[in-house]
Amino acid sequence: MILKVINHDFIYDMKNLCTVFFPWEKINDDGKDNIEVETKAQGNEFFVCARLFDKSISKTHILKENEDAQTEMSVLLYNVLSELTGFKPPWGILFGVRPAKLMHRFADEMGEKAARNYFINTFLATPQKTDLAIEVMHHENKIISLSSHNSFSLYVSIPFCPTRCAYCSFVSHSIEKTHKLLEPYVDLLCKELEKTGQVAKALGLRLETVYFGGGTPTTLSASQLSRLFDVIEKNFDLSTLREYTVEAGRPDTVTEDKLMALKGAGVGRISINPQSFNDEVLDTIGRRHTSKQTIDAFALARKCGFNNINMDLIAGLPKDTLSSFKNSVDTAVSLGAESVTVHTLAMKSAAYMVTRENAYDISDKLLTFDMVEYSNSCLKSSGYYPYYMYRQSKSVGNLENVGWCKDNMDCLYNVYMMDETHSVFAVGAGAVTRLKNQDTGKIERIYNFKYPYEYIDRFDEIIERKKLIEKFYAN
């Protein structure tokens, strides 16, 4: 699509709002395309014109003395694109990742009631989404209050999967192609964990949560997982640990010996992620397992003593219907999962599934909206509450991802990560360490190399960067 920004500096907002309505489109500022948008400021007069194929709409707005120019230009563009497409994004002009955190800031500044009104009347968020942000904020606050000034969390990246799902944009690698990297990767990951633990102990930091993500951590063997757990136990002070999570993820990687290795290491929370309980959908997105395998893996985890199991579902997957999505939610609830995380499909450029097909069709957005609405009502009526939430760009319908849980089954790491409550020391390929200054709120990031082969080939540089953690805390 073509986007022209004339006589104003709000290009970031304009691009993000265009992406809300047309998530599959690449944005340029010249050439020809089926979609053209022009935003223009002339003194206190704002002008927006948009064309979709042979249909065009234009609107103007005269900026009043007490109005914020950036917000009003965004509202004008939102109104034009809503009328042009017939679609009103439920989060209005908001496109940030952390709506609950934003709500928290506004509630602190002006009070919760005024913040709610501001979300609805200024940002054009629906009352339902606004109230969701408020509810999540309240649950998050209880968890955030547990963190201390010197707290931190540990994230362990296992960027390998049995196969790569068609919707996935994460830096994860099929073990069919990278099996030979697994053992050297684990060897070096043990060394990075050892060094990171030494740094954390020397700084006198308090470890709150450990989270193994990926990828699919249970792509590793039971013995490889045990090696990592042993290194963590030997090099980190686990006496303050509140939560230990491993994403088992793909049910086709879940075995009894791996589950017992997790249990023996003190892992208390795992994820077994169906994404869907519709086998046709699973086949379409490249997940080589069946819904029965998910149910069997869940039963095996129960047999091994796990009483805090999360299940991930995705709304908006190809071949999924409202009826089959409802069945997926109902199945997760009937199994008794302690938490259910409902994601909205996000079409990232690195995913195999990205296509312009149906890019202008509102029906996909409305179907996904109905799916999310059903999950919200079903989970709430089944005794779950929303404890954390985040949003992604290019999600279908500009919807959200929400973690729902039963009483006291919140994932602390998810909340700490999304709120940026404290530092997160991250190890492994693609991992990003986030260091938080508790006095200023400033976040500094240290990036590990993205790909396993880079991580292996340039490991000395990874270890050298640990000095940046010491430098940060010395200041």
Enumerate the predicted regions with their spans.
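Radical SAM enzyme core and accessory elements
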Residues: M1-E112, L189, D407-N475
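A C-terminal junction/extension of Radical SAM enzymes
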Residues: D33, A350-V427
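Short beta-strand motif preference
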Residues: V48-A50, V156, I272
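N-terminal [4Fe-4S]-dependent radical SAM core
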Residues: L84-K88, F106-L154, L203
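Canonical Radical SAM [4Fe-4S] cluster-binding loop centered on the CxxxCxxC motif
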Residues: H149-V186
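Short glycine-/small-residue motifs
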Residues: Y167, A337, A426-V427
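Conserved non-cysteine loop/helix-boundary elements of the Radical SAM core domain that shape
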Residues: S172-Y374
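Short, glycine-/Ser/Thr-/acidic-enriched flexible segments
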Residues: P217, K394, G430-T433
